[in-house]
Amino acid sequence: MPMDGLTLGFAAREINARIAGGRIDKITQPEKDAIVLLVRAESTNYKLLLCASPNNARLHFTNQNFSNPLEPPMFCMLLRKQLMSGRVLAVKQIGGDRVIHIDIDTVDEMGDHVLRRLILEIMGRHSNLILTDGEGRILDAARHVSLDMSRVRQVQPGLPYLPPPGQDKLDPVDVNEQNLLEYLTRAGDVPLHKAIAASVSGMSMPSSKEISLAPVRMSVFWISA
């Protein structure tokens, strides 16, 4: 099962329940597009993997012991400077899509509490890990996106963070029988699972196929749970 918006939403809620309020004790970057946060919460250590690999982007706890480079990458060094000993405020999915925000309360060089946000975007070859400050300004990212690479959205230190372009789809949280039926009708004469995928944000074909087998009321429950 791919990590679509539905799966990611369940994962985010589970992760938030375990590590919200926890302290970040260690940060490593075993691969170019993967970060591991060691979070201490409720007397338990959790290793949280955030991976922006184009082929296998994902978010989950792990017990794996990764091999890390002798010299930490620049992005990892910045994350350590900005996030070490910070407190996790929340892990949340944005708009039912495959975007995760991890909000962290930390202390800057002046001793003031500041907000930092670590963003995981799971978007195939456009997947990314991005760190922003409390005003939404990009501090750095695993992958920089220049104007030459994209005229729609750039990802560079110093620029304001812009979310991925939106789609005219239902947020799973807002799904009910009435609006789901309206969107399915709007999708036209296509198989039901394709209509669901085209109507609800973050839905993959495998998830849509499973949901299409259920009555509408049960489908609404699964989507908006």
Describe the predicted segments one by one.
Residues 6-67, 71:
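A structured, charge-rich N-terminal accessory region that forms the first stable segment of a protein
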Residues 43-225:
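Phosphate/anion-contacting hairpin/loop surfaces
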